[in-house]
Amino acid sequence: PRLSSAASDVYKRQVEMPFNPMSVALGAEASFVARSIDMDRDLTAHVLEEASKHKGSAFIEIYQNCNVFNDHAFEQLTSKEGRVANRINLVHGEKVIFGAEDELAVTIEDGEAKIVKRADIDDSQIYVHDTTKKNPSVAFSLSRLSHGPYGPTPVGVFRQVERETYNEDVIGQIESAKEAKGDGKIEQLIRSLGTWDVN
């Protein structure tokens, strides 16, 4: 669905299909990706704490209400009824179950995350969330369950994998070059072949 806001007559409807920030981050192989809601202090504190412990960069999407331009934009996730009906809490190692009476669940079928009624499946088919999967495809599929805060929406940590950071890789590359060719000297570099005089 295209998104719109009643805040301005000029910008009633967005022409372009907005991209999904979570999907972009996961598609770019981000090693830590999470989503929270500004009004949920406990969830936000948990997500920020996990991000601070993560080695490397962390991407966090926070649904933040703006009472000027888009007030009540996240009511489907923050209202008393919406919180129970639509929030899909992702907790590492736990089955993904939600709904007012835990009547809904998430399954992974053919690599795609789907929302199903628990009455229609066996509990063994319910997806058990794993933030440490090296392959981001499941996390990516979870990010596609919603596009904006409308209807059932996953929140929490989607992906949290350990790997060498960019900084560590660059330092390692420099150290390897030093071992192979020595420390190198700037004067030697300046006077090396391939230089010329400008008259």
Residue ranges and their predicted role:
Residues L26-E29, L48, S52-K55, S146, ...:
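Structural signal for hydrophobic packing residues in well-ordered secondary-structure cores
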Residues P1-A7, Y11:
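Single conserved hydrophobic/aromatic residue that forms the stacking wall/gate
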Residues D9-E50:
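Conserved thiamine diphosphate
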